[in-house]
Amino acid sequence: MFKTEPFIEESIEEIRKQINNRKTIIALSGGVDSAVAAVLTDRAVGDKLLAVYVDTGLMRKNESEEIWKIFKEQMGLNLKIVEAKDIFLKELEGVIDPEEKRKIIGRLFIEVFEKVAEEQGEEVLVQGTIAPDWIESEGQIKTHHNIALPGGMVLDVVEPLRELYKDEVRLLAVALGLPDQIAHRQPFPGPGLAVRILGEITDEKLAICKEANFIVSEEIEKTELKNELWQYFAAVLDTKATGVKGDIRDYNWVVALRFVSSLDAMTAHTPEIPFDLIKKISKRITSEIPNVTRVVLDVTDKPPATIEFE
């Protein structure tokens, strides 16, 4: 059985040894993995840590504001927000292949961190990599942004959570005193909404994806399902379908809903969701997002599917 206190003590000591009194940055995403890694590193090296959050433009609605409030104002971390939306979206123009998207995002993430590190004199990059990240990458299922590091990297990498699974990381978060909204926050992919937009990422599809995910989260979090589901989200498919709005024929985008239960993300199943809730979410999406004509439900388990669409 996983014991949090011995792990915390050993991890802090190991982080301190690996960093060896050098200035350090951490890739802070706002999720539980990077949050736990940040707190452990802060306890190990204190003011030598700079938490860096990159706004790629691919994050959830109001994400940057929430990150600042939680990690800077509430938790007191030394936090720097890097506005990089234009860089990421420009590089992703015309890219359709999901693996290519992930590799581009991974490369840009590290380039941004390296630039900040050079400006601040940093030498070490801490990441919130957990076991499913590198297990999936080595099995060539998906390449996660915090594994596909480009050649010639100038920063040493420290991954204090590399051998842990999500349920263990959540236990650590509670033991470390992290806010409940972080400790029990649903996982969010490193590449952000890029993997929930099938095909090319356009401003139109990105806006749809942000709003649809906001609606899904808002409705689920009104119910007890928020404590039962591993993930709940919406994806924008790379196809359009015919619909009717008013008395006028409409040909527009299709949004897919995804709800899964899991313990460690290695396997997942689709639980039964109250149909009236699904209908409510569907109605909100099609009425509040003008360029969506249809909402579908994905009920595929993992395996054979992965949790995210790309």
Curated annotation (Swiss-Prot):
It comes from the Archaea. CDD domains: GMP_synthase_C. One of its GO terms (molecular function) is ATP binding. One of its GO terms (cellular component) is cytosol. SUPFAM superfamilies: Adenine nucleotide alpha hydrolases-like (SSF52402). ATP binds at S29, G30, G31, V32, D33, S34, A35. It catalyses: XMP + L-glutamine + ATP + H2O = GMP + L-glutamate + AMP + diphosphate + 2 H(+). Pathway: Purine metabolism; GMP biosynthesis; GMP from XMP (L-Gln route): step 1/1. Its EC number is 6.3.5.2. Keywords: ATP-binding, GMP biosynthesis, Ligase, Nucleotide-binding, Purine biosynthesis. It holds the Pfam family NAD_synthase. InterPro entries: GMP_synth_C (IPR001674), GMP_synthase_B (IPR026598), GMPS_ATP_PPase_dom (IPR025777), NAD/GMP_synthase (IPR022310), Rossmann-like_a/b/a_fold (IPR014729). Residues 2-185 form the GMPS ATP-PPase domain. Heterodimer composed of a glutamine amidotransferase subunit (A) and a GMP-binding subunit (B). Catalyzes the synthesis of GMP from XMP. NCBIfam families: guaA_Cterm. This is GMP synthase [glutamine-hydrolyzing] subunit B. It comes from Methanococcus maripaludis (strain DSM 14266 / JCM 13030 / NBRC 101832 / S2 / LL). The lineage of its organism: Archaea, Methanobacteriati, Methanobacteriota, Methanomada group, Methanococci.
